[in-house]
Swiss-Prot record:
The chain crosses the membrane at residues 87-107, 112-132, 178-198. GO terms for cellular component: plasma membrane. This is Uncharacterized protein y4fL. Belongs to the inositol monophosphatase superfamily. GO terms for molecular function: inositol monophosphate 1-phosphatase activity; metal ion binding. It is found in: Cell membrane. Mg(2+) 2 binds at residues 85, 88, 208. GO terms for biological process: inositol metabolic process; phosphatidylinositol phosphate biosynthetic process; signal transduction. It comes from Sinorhizobium fredii (strain NBRC 101917 / NGR234). It holds the Pfam family Inositol_P. It is a multi-pass membrane protein.
Length: 275
């Protein structure tokens, strides 16, 4: 990793931690937060905007010329840039559910190369460069040799229901328990930390998944981001014995694009590991 990326990774870790602490203070005082909507069942609050503004100020204090793209303020994504989701899992955050994340990545040559995800209500911070290693502190620090039986699905409204149900049924048929955490970044952090076997979501945004994608790659978990013409993406972080076929795309993502024809059921994999 180049020296400028080393510097940015240190900054990324510090900023994500600080923004997490900022958001956590507001999470403890939800009665004073005004909730707005950006679209159907798409919520935002002053906490989201203020957290993103803090991240922008902290980045520009050290790298004033760097471009920044955020969920709430957008920006120039055609050059190297920082990518911010100040509170991923806003519905959880506004409901007092502790499964939400601060997700910040750095993108070089249109590829996420650095990422950090804070789970402030779980006292957890994970960060990495895409080539590793994965670093972590707190209650969800990385596990080695884990064999999780839960698989995460992002139940995004733009993912065609028939395709999503097909994917869920396929994972269940292989012995996985399906969970939806309500935060793409939190779920990918759980994959990287060895708590979830994998994660799939269609119709999300790059700021939701870029940092988590980096964490998964750093942890050795295969992860792919598939782009659509409308700017949305699909994220697939799958176990080692699964893969994404070359014909997969975000719009038609379904079971046949994720599984090897001969991929083992989870029960077979776990039995083999116990031998």
């Amino acid at each position: 990793m180049t020296s400028d990326l080393d510097t940015r990774l240190d900054l990324l870790r510090n900023i994500t931690s600080k923004v997490g602490a900022f958001a956590l203070a507001r999470f403890g005082n939800l009665s004073h937060i005004v909730i707005e909507t950006k679209g159907e069942a798409d919520y935002v609050s002053a906490a989201d905007r203020d957290a993103e503004s803090l991240a922008r100020r902290l980045i520009h204090a050290q790298f004033p010329a760097d471009a920044i793209v955020g969920e709430e303020q957008l920006g120039d994504a055609e050059v190297d840039h920082w990518l911010i989701d100040p509170i991923d899992g806003t519905a959880n955050f506004l409901s007092g559910i502790p499964l939400w994340a601060v997700s910040i990545a750095f993108v070089r040559n249109k590829e996420p190369v650095l990422g950090a995800v804070a789970l402030p209500a779980l006292d957890t911070l994970l960060w990495a460069s895409v080539d590793g290693p994965l670093h972590g502190t707190g209650s969800v620090s990385p596990l080695v040799g884990a064999q999780p039986i839960a698989f995460g699905i992002g139940r995004n409204r733009t993912w065609p229901l028939a395709h999503r149900l097909e994917v869920e049924a396929a994972f269940e048929a292989r012995g996985y328990h399906i969970v939806c955490l309500g935060s793409c970044a939190a779920a990918l952090a759980m994959v990287a930390a060895g708590r979830l076997a994998g994660y799939v979501e269609h119709g999300t945004h790059l700021w939701d998944c870029a940092a988590g994608h980096v964490l998964c790659r750093a942890a050795g978990a295969p992860s792919s981001i598939l782009f659509e013409a409308d700017g949305k993406v699909a994220i697939i972080a799958a176990p080692q014995h699964l893969r994404v076929t070359a014909k997969a795309d975000a719009r038609s993502l379904s079971e046949k694009h994720i599984f090897d024809p001969g991929s083992d059921r989870i029960s077979h994999r776990m039995e083999s590991s116990a031998d």
